[in-house]
């Protein structure tokens, strides 16, 4: 199957480059395609390598609407291309599982540190922790679950009215 795996970055074989410590990898997922958010926020080209993995297992794990799946995969490829144009070293690969994609990336590039923004699912978070990925706080939501847990601690009842009042005070709205 020609073109099954698109490699957008290759390691440099120069002896001088091999003496340098490996740069960290920022792993970006299909629902985190934002240059100003998560583990990519504030990063400049040359500071990190960016990893994208199309996982067969994840794709086949549920019945996706064809157009939605196409949209997500296309958005990942386009975002990878944008980062490449910006000067980032990008490794875009397909693998059986996310873990296999990460292991292949680490084996190829000698990466010691992999960062990713917390996934939106608990299962995804547990998987990344199991793989030894350093997680960066997910800033895609208005209220992080840690903030909510702090607010909810010790309350006898959780009501939307109380939560909204707390949010308005916390965010300076109204």
Predicted features, each with a name:
Residues 8-24, 29-42, 138, 146-173:
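N-terminal donor/sugar-recognition subdomains of glycan-related enzymes
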Residues 63-108, 113, 118-126, 155:
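N-terminal Rossmann-like or analogous alpha/beta NTP/dinucleotide-binding catalytic cores
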Residues 31, 55, 95-96, 119-121, ...:
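An acidic- and aromatic-residue-enriched active-site/binding cleft used to recognize and process polar
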Residues 101-174:
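Beta-rich, aromatic/charged-enriched effector core domains that present basic-aromatic interfaces
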Residues 11-93:
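N-terminal beta-strand-loop-alpha-helix module at the start
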């Amino acid at each position: 199957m020609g073109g099954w795996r698109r490699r957008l970055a290759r390691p440099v074989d120069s002896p001088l480059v091999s003496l340098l410590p490996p740069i960290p990898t920022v792993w970006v997922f299909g629902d985190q395609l934002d240059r100003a958010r998560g583990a990519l926020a504030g990063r400049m080209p040359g500071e990190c390598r960016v990893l994208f993995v199309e996982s067969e297992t994840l794709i086949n794990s549920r019945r996706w609407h064809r157009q939605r799946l196409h949209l997500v995969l296309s958005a990942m490829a386009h975002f990878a291309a944008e980062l490449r144009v910006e000067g980032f070293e990008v490794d875009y690969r397909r693998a059986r599982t996310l873990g296999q994609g990460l292991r292949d990336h680490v084996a190829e590039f000698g990466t010691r540190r992999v960062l990713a923004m917390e996934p939106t699912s608990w299962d995804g978070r547990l998987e990344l922790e199991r793989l030894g990925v350093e997680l960066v706080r997910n800033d895609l939501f208005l209220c992080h679950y840690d903030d909510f847990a702090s607010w909810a601690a010790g309350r006898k009842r959780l009501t939307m009215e109380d939560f909204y009042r707390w949010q308005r005070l916390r965010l300076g709205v109204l």
